Structure formats: C-alpha cells, structure tokens
Amino acid sequence: IRDKLVTGVQTCALPISDGINPSSCRNVRISDCFISVGDDCITIKSGRDADGRKYGKACENITITNCVMLSGHGGVVIGSEMSGGVRRVTISNCVFDGTDSGIRLKSSRGRGGVVEELRVDNIVMKNIQRNAFIFDLFYDKESKVEPVSERTPVFRNIHLSNITGSDIKQIGYIKGIEEMPVQGLSFSNINMKAEVGFIVDIAEDIRFDNVDFSSQTGSPWQFSKCKQIVLNNVRSKYPVNQQPIVTFEDVDNAIINNCFQMTPVKDFYKANNSHIIEGHNYWKKESFK
C-alpha cells in the first residue's frame, strides 16, 4: 500500500487484536486516532525471515501523530516481523496511557532487516505497565551467536526527544546481540520516573542529553558491554539511597560531561573494567556519619 492516510480512527476493547498494522507500506500517515485494544495499538512490519527478505519491501515514510493509545501491549511497536526493513518513521504528539510498553522495537537472529531513521518526539507516557522504551535484538532468547549475514537484524540511527513519563514500571532497556550491537541512539530532553531504571546491554554510540531518570530501586542508568556512551547534562532528581546514578560494566569510552547532580548522592557513578572520561561536572555528595 502506498500514499495512505488513516485519520480519526477509534478502536476500543478489541480482544487479542492489533489496532493499526501497516506492513511493507510506503507514505502512510496515521493521525488523530484513539486506540484501545488487546494487543499492540500500532504495529509496523515488513515480512518475516527468508520470505520477508526475498520479497524485500520495506515499510517506509510512515508518520504517526496526534494519537492517544490506551491499554494494549504496546503503544507503537516495530517488529518482530521486519525482515524487509523499516525506515524513515516519525512518531510525534502522542499520549500513551496504560499500555504495557510505549515505544517497542523487537527482532531476533534469523529475521535480518534494518530498522533505521526513526524519530520520536513530544510524547507523554503514564501508567506504563512494563517498559517505556524497548530496543531488543534478542527477542528469541533461545538463539545462538552466529556470523553476521542477511539473517542478522540491525537497529540504528534512532532519536527520541521531548518525552515525559510517570507511574512507569521500568524506564526500559536496550539489548543487542554479540555479533550486532544496537547502534546510534540518542535521547534528549526526557524526564522519566519509574520503579526500575534504564538498562543498556551490548550497544554502541548511545547518547543522552538533558535527561532526568529516577528509579525507586537500583541505578537509573546501567550499562554493560557497551562502547561510545555519552552522558551530557544528565541527573536523577530522586536518587536511591547509597546507589550510584550510573553503573558501568565492561564499557569502553564513556564520557560524562556537564552533569550537575543537585540532589545529594554518595557516588554519581561506579565503574568496573571500564574507561570513563569526566569533564565539567558537579556532583553534590551525601554526608554520612
């Protein structure tokens, strides 16, 4: 399908059903919709495994704007059937209230395909039952490491900005695979308060600018097996007692810059087997007797 406008749709209380599902489509605009379903509210797909790669029709030039998502497993989901690729997608001016997840990208070994050039802006999330953000290349937990090939999925060049969230179970996670890290994500002007923070495992070139993450347990940011991490002007308004704001495990080249942690903490970060560069920071220390 090409050059399609979907506007003013209201879907409510559909059991075990997606709301709107563009698959291998081009030039689609979804706007001014109210969606409350039993499965994902909006799902973008492009075929599955070898058949999807052979057909080779990406889902591209997709705009989602001015929509409200209530309940449903995911607000906007890409995958896991994305073997033909998904590119040039914008999601803006939306509310997610009561969905299991907000923005969710999922794939696994064997799928192949590239998800890239995704922009998410001006989003409000509330009462998210699981994760606000998911970027998961390890959806099939039984898969084993294999050489990079057409079977290898890729997530890259994804940017999220101007997002607020409250009453959230977990801010989210990034999960790459050993042969293909998640690459080139940026988060800017984001404020999230959740029970659990943001966990990043096997990723590179990940950047946070003017971001406030607060979690009720553990550290708001947790990085492992990562490269090229930039934390610029990040903080936690409600840090957990004696927990660092950031933890690094096996991280190569992380930069912490312009971070002003005004709520006192014992340690802004803790690192193990990691290379960390600091610059122009102020971290107010807790006083311990």
Residue ranges and their predicted role:
Residues I1-C12:
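Single conserved hydrophobic/aromatic residue that forms the stacking wall/gate
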